[in-house]
Amino acid sequence: RGESSGSSDRKKSEFVTMCESRVVTAHGIFNSNNTTQGEINMTAYTVRDAKIEDAQRILEIYAYYVENTAITFEYDVPSKEEFKQRMRMTMQKYPYLVIEKEGRVYGYAYAGPFKERAAYDWACELSIYVDHAAKKCGLGKQLYAALTERLKQMGITNLYACIGYPQTEDEYLDKNSEQFHEHLGFQTVGTFHRCGYKFNRWY
């Protein structure tokens, strides 16, 4: 596990990548002027707080990653009721956001505690999932920008995202997540090796 010495006068975000992964530190706020190839006009998309009523659609987005990728290390798609309970637990303290267009949710992101000890109260772990058919369209960047701003307002100074990173890309895991975070200014600060086993292989 990578560690950083967080301080309130130096805003920095860090993310931990698992499975040959890395913990990354981002300095400052994500630059909204950075654009990527294939980025779409975001004016039609809206970021808002998630509602429990969104659970079914959010679970549909997540289920693809559970069943087809090593992006999440979960083996089985949770039930709708279990997923609702996870959402409720997060919403008690942290922001849980969705991005939608014309009433349809295309992605979601949320924060949670990095560790349970009181001294970690200024640190959060981030999670983000975008409809697999709408990846690399700028939705993730817009979600992260909104989530980061909300967490800043809460006084959070350190952000972590634990992501899978393959030494060699395969059909279950590529390096897109690492590249996405690097594009937003994250930097590697730590690595776990062979810490997750899924699809009969180590990550």
Regions found by a protein language model. Give the residues of each.
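Glycine-rich phosphate/pyrophosphate-binding loop shared by adenosine-nucleotide-utilizing enzymes
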Residues: T43-Y45, G103-Y108, Y203
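A short beta-loop-alpha structural element at the N-terminal edge
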Residues: T46-I58
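Helix-loop element at the rim of GNAT/NAT acetyltransferase active sites that forms part
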Residues: E60-V77, T90
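Acetyl-CoA-dependent GNAT
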Residues: Y75-A133, Y144, R150
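A short, internal acetyl-CoA/4′-phosphopantetheine-binding micro-motif in the GNAT/acyltransferase core
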Residues: S127-K136, I163-T168
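Conserved acetyl-CoA-binding loop-helix of GNAT-fold acetyltransferases
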Residues: K136-E149, D174-Q179, H183
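Conserved GNAT acetyl-CoA-binding A-motif
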Residues: L151-L173
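Conserved catalytic-core motifs of GNAT/GCN5-like acyltransferases
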Residues: C162-G164, E178, E182-R201
